[in-house]
Amino acid sequence: MWPVGSSYTRACSVQRWPKRCVYWAPSPQNVLEINPHRFQESRRSAALYRKHVVESKLNLIKKELLKAELDNVVQTNLANSQAITDYLTTLEDLANILVDRAQQPASSNQGGARPQTDPHVPQPAPAIPSAPPKENTTTVVIAPGDSGYTFSTNFLREFLSGLYATSASWLPSYGPWFTAMTANAMQRRVFPKELKGTANLKNSTSLKLITEVLTTVASINVDFYTDLRNLSDFNAALCILNAYYCKTQGHPLPASREELLDNLGPKIAALVADIKGLGSDSNITFTFTFSSGQQAATIAPVNGDGRYNKDFFSNHKIFRLLVAKEVVLLPNFTNVPGATDGPDYIYALTSALFSDNIPPFGNYQLNLRSGIKGVEYLILVYLTLANAQLSKPDGRRLHLKALLGAAFEHSSKVQLFKRDEVFTFLMKEYVLPILSHNNNISTTELFPGMALAALEVGNQINFDPNKHFVNLAGTKFTKIFNVLNQKLMFKDVRELLVAKSELRVALENGLAATLNSIAPVNAVVEVIQKQFGGGDDYDRLYFLVLGCLPVTVAVV
C-alpha cells in the first residue's frame, strides 16, 4: 500500500501546459480558417507597397539626376553670363576712354592756347585701352607638318560643324559604314525625328546625326557613376602602365600627370613584349570570366563590397602579368610569401597625382577593370601607329585642304619617321593639351575611331569567316541607336544606363576579340580600310582621332 504523502507529491509534480499553448496542441477539434478575400487583399496590399517602394526609389534617383543636370545648366549659364558681363564692362571702359580723349582737344581749344610744357620733364604715357579677355581655347596638332586646330569646348563637335559651312555646294561623305548606318536609321520607325535631316537623303549624313552618333561612341567609356573613388579608364591605364614600367625597370615614379605621358611608347612596348612571353595557353585570353548573366551585362561589380568574383580576372593575360610582377597586389592570386607587403605602385600614383579618395585597385576593382581595358585600348592605338609613315599619299582618302579650305596647311616635305615617333608626337601635341583641358577624359573621347574599329571586329567574330555574305539586318547599329533613343526620345534614366552598359560591354568584347586575333594590327587596318575608306597611315591616324574620314560630295 502506497503512502498517502508520496501519491500527493507525485500528483502535484505533474507538469501542466499553460492555457496559451492549448490552441497549438494537436487536436481534431482545431480548425484553421482562411478568408480568401482577406488573403487576396493582403497580397494586393503587399504588391502595392512593393510598387510604391520601387517607384519611390526611382523617383529619388530621377530627382538626383535632374538636380545634377540642372546644376550643370545653371553653372554653364552663370559662366556665360559672367563672360557677357565682362565683355560689357570692357566695352564700357573703352567707350569712356574714347569719350575722354575726344573731349580733351575740345576743352583745350576753348581755353585758348595750350599750356607750355617742359620738354625735359617726362610726360605720362597715354592710357591704352585694355583688350577684351580672350576665350579659353585649346590648340592641338594631330599629324606632323599639319596645321593646328583651336577649339573651345569639344574638338570633335567643332570640327564636324565646320564641315557643313558650305552645305549649298558640297556635303561630306564618311564611307560605307556611315552610309549603311544612315540608311538603317532612316528606315527605323522608332528613331529621333530631329536626327532625320534632309542631308541624309543626299548621299551624305546630316550634321545632327553624325554628331550624335560619334558623340555616343566617344562617350562609351565615360563613367556615369558619381563616386569619388572612380578614375577614368585613361588615367587608370596610365597608372597601370607607369607602375608596371617603374616596377619592372627600376625607374622612379612620375612626379606629375604630364610625366605619365613621357616615353609612353616604350612603356607600352615593354608590356607588349612581356605579354608575348606568356606563351600560347588557349585558356588565358583578353576576356573576363563572368559568373552570372547579370554581371556579364553590367560594368560595376554586382557584389556590394566593390569587388568581382574571385575568378573574374583570373584568365586575363594582362591581369596575370600584373599579378606575376607584383604590380597588382591581391593575396588570393599570389603564392609568394610576403608579396602583398611590398609597395603598391599604382596606389602611390593615384594618391599622389589624383586624389586620396581613390582606394587601391585591389579593393575597388571597378578601376582595375576599366584600367585593364584602357591598357588594351592604348595597346591597339600604339600598335597601329608604331611604324606609321605619313609622307606617302598612296591611296589616301582624307584631303583636309578640300574640306577646310585655305586655312589648312600641309607640309609637302618628305620625312621618314622613326619607330614610335608619330605616336610620341600625338601624345605630346594632341593628348597632353586635351588632358590639361579635361583631366578626367576617357580613351574613347581621345580616340573614338578605335572604338568603332573594335566594335566592328567584335561584330565580325559572330559570323562564319568561310561564308561570304552581306549583312542587311543592321544589327550592329542597334546598341548605338538604343542609346540615342533613350537619350532623345524615351528619356528613361534607368533604361539609358542599361543601354550604355550594353554598349560598353560590347566594346570590351570587341577589344578582346581584336587582341585575341592572330594579327590585331591587320584586323584594325582591314576594318578601317573596308568600312571607313582609310588607305594609308595618315588616314588611320586621323580616323583614330576623329572617328571618320570625310570627303566632299557635290550636292545635286
From Swiss-Prot:
Map out region (Interaction with major capsid protein/MCP) in residue numbers: 1-54
- What single Pfam family name could you report for this chain, choosing any that match? Herpes_UL25
Gene Ontology cellular-component terms for this entry are: host cell; host cell nucleus; viral capsid
**Comp. bias regions, Pro residues:** 121-132
Outline the segment boundaries, as ranges, of region: Disordered.
Answer: 104-136
Highest taxon listed in the record's lineage: Viruses
Provide the primary localization: virion
Name the GO terms of the biological process aspect: symbiont entry into host cell; viral genome packaging; viral penetration into host nucleus
Annotated InterPro entries: Herpes_UL25 (IPR002493)
Q: Which UniProt keywords apply?
A: Capsid protein, Host nucleus, Host-virus interaction, Viral genome packaging, Viral penetration into host nucleus, Viral release from host cell, Virion, Virus entry into host cell
Q: Where in the cell is it found?
A: Virion; Host nucleus
UniProt key word Chloroplast: no
Q: How does it assemble?
A: Heterodimerizes with CVC1. Interacts with major capsid protein/MCP and triplex capsid protein 1/TRX1 at the pentamer vertices. Interacts with the large tegument protein/LTP.
Free-text function comment from the UniProt entry: Capsid vertex-specific component that plays a role during viral DNA encapsidation, assuring correct genome cleavage and presumably stabilizing capsids that contain full-length viral genomes. Participates in the interaction between the capsid and the tegument through interaction with the large tegument protein/LTP.
Q: Which family does it belong to?
A: Belongs to the herpesviridae CVC2 protein family.
This protein is called what? Capsid vertex component 2
The organism is Alcelaphine herpesvirus 1 (strain C500)
Originating gene: CVC2
